[in-house]
UniProtKB/Swiss-Prot annotation:
PROSITE patterns to which the protein is assigned, alphabetical: NAD_G3PDH
UniProt lineage: Bacteria, Pseudomonadati, Pseudomonadota, Gammaproteobacteria, Alteromonadales
Name by which UniProt lists this protein: Glycerol-3-phosphate dehydrogenase [NAD(P)+]
One protein family per Pfam: NAD_Gly3P_dh_C
Species assigned in the record: Shewanella halifaxensis (strain HAW-EB4)
GO molecular function: glycerol-3-phosphate dehydrogenase [NAD(P)+] activity; NAD binding
Pathway: Membrane lipid metabolism; glycerophospholipid metabolism
C-alpha cells in the first residue's frame, strides 16, 4: 500500500501541488514528485508547500516523493504539471520508468518553445503511440483550488475510457467540477493563447488604459484564439467554454495571474528582465508569446494583439507604441474573417 497510488503528479510547483491537494482531498492516494529533493523534503517536514502555497496543509493522502522511479511505479495514471519548456525533458526522463499500463495527462499550458508545436506532438515524439494521452485545462488559480474554493475545468483525451476515469478521479462535488470535452487540440491551444492576451491586458492597464480597453482586448483576443484554433482543426465552440473564454477572462482580469502582472509591470516601465524578477515565478506567457507568434506566422493566421505583444517582449517596442498601432489599424467589420 505504501508504494501505490491512485494517481502520480509530476511537478511540485503551485499548480501541481494544488491539483494533488484536490485529488487527495477527494479521497485518492496521490503521489507528488518534484525534481528538487530538498523541496520535497520540505513538503514532508512542513506538511505544506511553503514555497508556493504557504499556509495550506497537505492532506494525509498526499505523498511527496523525490525519486521519479518510485513515483511512476506507484500508479498507471500520470498527471504532468510542469512548464511547457521542460515538458519534453521531463517526459523523456519518465519514459523508461513508465509502467506498461501508464496513461498520461497533462495540465501544462503552452506550446513547444521555438517550434510552436502542440504539447501532444511533443508527447507523441517522446512516447510514440503506446500510451493514452489527455489534457486538462480551464480557469484555475492554484491558490484557490488548493484552498478548496469552487473551480471548473475541462478534460479531453485520445481514449474515451481514460477521459471518463479522469473525470471521476478529479471531480469533487465540494471543490472541483470537471467537464469532458472531445476537442483535444482546442483545449491545448486555449491554455497557451490566453497567456499572451493576458500580458496584453496587463500592458493596457499598465499604461493607464481602463476597463473599456481591457474588455476590447479580451473580446478580440478570443477572436484571435478562435481563428488560430480553427486553422489547426479545433472546434470554435470549445473557445466559448472553460479552456477558452473562461481561462481568458480569469487570466486577463485578476492580479493572481502572473501573466497579467508581468504585462502590468512592463506597461508601467519595467523592462522584460526586471518584470520577470518582480513576478518571482515562471511567466509562461513570455515563452508562449513567441510560440504562438511563430505558429500563427507559419499558418498565415492574422493575430494583431499577439503580434504587438511579441513586438514589446522580443523587439523592444514600447507598450504605448504597440497600443497606438492596434488602435490605428484599418477599420473592418467586427464579423469579418480578419481583424
Amino acid at each position: 500500500m505504501k508504494n501505490t497510488a491512485d494517481i502520480t503528479v509530476l511537478g511540485a510547483g503551485s499548480y501541481g501541488t494544488a491539483l494533488a491537494i484536490s485529488l487527495a482531498s477527494n479521497g485518492h492516494r496521490t503521489m507528488l514528485w518534484g525534481h528538487e529533493p530538498e523541496h520535497i523534503e520540505n513538503l514532508k517536514n512542513d506538511k505544506s508547500n511553503e514555497a508556493f502555497l504557504p499556509g495550506i496543509p497537505l492532506p494525509d493522502l498526499l505523498i511527496p516523493e523525490a525519486d521519479l522511479a518510485t513515483a511512476l511505479a506507484a500508479s498507471n495514471n500520470v498527471l504532468v504539471v510542469v512548464p511547457s519548456h521542460v515538458f519534453g525533458l521531463v517526459l523523456s526522463q519518465a519514459k523508461p520508468l513508465l509502467r506498461k499500463d501508464s496513461r498520461i495527462v497533462w495540465a501544462t499550458k503552452g506550446l513547444e518553445p521555438e517550434t510552436g508545436r502542440l504539447i501532444q506532438d511533443v508527447a507523441r515524439e517522446v512516447l510514440g503511440d503506446e500510451y493514452p494521452l489527455a489534457v486538462l485545462s480551464g480557469p484555475t488559480f492554484a491558490k484557490e483550488l488548493a484552498a478548496g474554493m469552487p473551480t471548473a475545468i475541462s478534460i479531453a483525451g485520445t481514449d474515451p475510457q481514460f477521459t471518463k476515469d479522469l473525470v471521476e478521479l478529479l471531480h469533487s462535488p465540494k471543490r472541483l467540477r470537471v467537464y469532458a470535452n472531445d476537442d483535444f487540440i482546442g483545449l491545448q491551444l486555449g491554455g497557451a493563447v490566453k497567456n499572451v492576451i493576458a500580458i496584453g491586458a496587463g500592458l493596457s492597464d499598465g499604461i493607464g488604459f481602463g476597463a473599456n480597453a481591457r474588455t476590447a482586448l479580451i473580446t478580440r483576443g478570443l477572436v484571435e484564439l478562435t481563428r488560430l484554433g480553427e486553422a489547426m482543426g479545433a472546434q470554435a465552440s470549445t473557445f466559448m467554454g472553460m479552456a477558452g473564454l473562461g481561462d481568458l477572462v480569469l487570466t486577463c482580469t485578476d492580479n493572481q495571474s502572473r501573466n497579467r502582472r508581468f504585462g502590468l509591470a512592463l506597461g508601467k516601465g519595467s523592462d522584460v528582465e526586471a518584470a520577470q524578477e518582480e513576478i518571482g515565478q515562471v511567466v509562461e506567457g513570455y515563452r508562449n508569446t513567441k510560440e504562438v507568434y511563430t505558429l500563427a506566422k507559419r499558418l498565415g493566421v492574422e493575430m494583431p494583439i499577439t503580434e504587438q505583444v511579441y513586438q514589446v517582449l522580443y523587439k523592444g517596442k514600447s507598450p504605448v507604441d504597440a497600443a497606438k498601432e492596434l488602435l490605428s489599424r484599418e477599420q473592418k467589420s467586427e464579423t469579418s474573417s480578419a481583424e
